[in-house]
Amino acid sequence: MTFSVERVRADFPVLNREVNGQPLAYLDSAASAQKPEAVIGAEAEFYRHGYAAVHRGIHTLSAEATARMEAVRQQAANFLNAGSAEEVVFVRGTTEGINLVANSWGNANVGAGDNIIISEMEHHANIVPWQMLCARVGAELRVIPLNPDGTLQLDVVPGLFDPRTRLLAITEVSNVLGTENPLAALIALAHQHGAKVLVDGAQAVMHHPVDVQALGCDFYVFSGHKLYGPTGIGVLYGRSELLQAMAPWEGGGSMIATVSLTEGTTWNRAPWRFEAGTPNTGGIIGLGAALTYVSQLGLTQIAEYEQTLMRYALEALRAVPDLILYGPAQRKGVIAFNLGQHHAYDVGSFLDNYGIAVRTGHHCAMPLMARYQVPAMCRASLAMYNTTEEVDRLVAGLQRIHKLLG
């Protein structure tokens, strides 16, 4: 099927609204993507006609809800090309998935004198859990520095590994710079040193196909709400032998096999031992609808359209005086910028007056802001429903702001 942005836009009700008297130009999908009618409808239909608590229920609605939930687990496994549905853990989002690994695998496998490697471009969700783990156990956190263009200093990376390196935690695509990291080479290097690899895929899964078996990563995590799905649901992929060896990090219902006041508790097998309590079943149903939606459009076709739009945007933005762009020429999803010495909040507020939604601030990447010696940046993100006309409006808006503010 040929990709049609007009057909895609027709599936997203919010794109019909106006903001401040102007048609909405939503350029903030990297923070959270809008939802197609298919996702909204699937979740609403579940709550209207199919809701019940999953697991252990013998009545029809419970059995149906359980089957639908487990079907989405298989669907997510297929989406990532995982080896089995039992390698998919439902989590609240990328942040919870990383914390799960840090608190379960990390507590058991990282000790005093060991080290973990991250990069300078990471989202706080892929920094803070490892800082907390290192503080708990007396390990060292090592950081891959960046080049001025926002790519990794790859020549430094081999020297960061040693026999005490336990984990490389790395983003696939930077949420600020759009840098796409060379995962295959990094994963191979980590494995040569006996280290495991966790990939933060939050900014990647909506932009291109992901194959965790081809990558060879040990853990991969993403959030549904950035993939046109609901909030409060995400996926943690973990290699089966790792998940089965990991202890649960939360206790409660569903994650147990047996509970005894005298003999203690035994755990369910993975992935269910990591899903304590009543799950976000509606969110899981919505996630399944989102996976179906993007799969039917074709991630390869989506990627081709978005890359064409990105090239158009980077060229068009050259017409804005005093615009400072951050990040490499080859990027995915996002364009971070500042306009002269004007604060990002001021620029973002003016753009909002023109009906253009961008993100402003440190983007949960304060170390990256420190690297560029700025308190904040504006970030325009491009999704499959954005258009060249919206890019033109962004350019015109920035030109107008420059003229007004000088």
Curated annotation (Swiss-Prot):
Per its record, the protein catalyses:
(sulfur carrier)-H + L-cysteine = (sulfur carrier)-SH + L-alanine; L-selenocysteine + AH2 = hydrogenselenide + L-alanine + A + H(+)
Which terms does the record give in the GO molecular function aspect?
cysteine desulfurase activity; pyridoxal phosphate binding; selenocysteine lyase activity
The Gene Ontology CC terms held by the record are:
cytoplasm
This protein's UniProt keywords: Cytoplasm, Lyase, Pyridoxal phosphate, Transferase
Q: Which cofactor does it need?
A: pyridoxal 5'-phosphate
Q: Where in the cell is it found?
A: Cytoplasm
- Record's Pfam families? Aminotran_5
The EC number on file is 2.8.1.7, 4.4.1.16
Q: Which residues carry this modification: N6-(pyridoxal phosphate)lysine?
A: K226
Which pathway does the UniProt entry assign to this protein?
Answer: Cofactor biosynthesis; iron-sulfur cluster biosynthesis
A GO biological process of this protein is: cysteine metabolic process
Q: Which residues form the active site?
A: C364
Q: Which family does it belong to?
A: Belongs to the class-V pyridoxal-phosphate-dependent aminotransferase family. Csd subfamily.
Q: What does this protein do?
A: Cysteine desulfurases mobilize the sulfur from L-cysteine to yield L-alanine, an essential step in sulfur metabolism for biosynthesis of a variety of sulfur-containing biomolecules. Component of the suf operon, which is activated and required under specific conditions such as oxidative stress and iron limitation. Acts as a potent selenocysteine lyase in vitro, that mobilizes selenium from L-selenocysteine. Selenocysteine lyase activity is however unsure in vivo.
Record PANTHER family: CYSTEINE DESULFURASE (PTHR43586:SF25)
> What do we know about how this protein assembles, alone or with others?
Homodimer. Interacts with SufE and the SufBCD complex composed of SufB, SufC and SufD. The interaction with SufE is required to mediate the direct transfer of the sulfur atom from the S-sulfanylcysteine.
Annotated protein name in UniProt: Cysteine desulfurase
Q: What organism is the protein native to?
A: Klebsiella pneumoniae (strain 342)
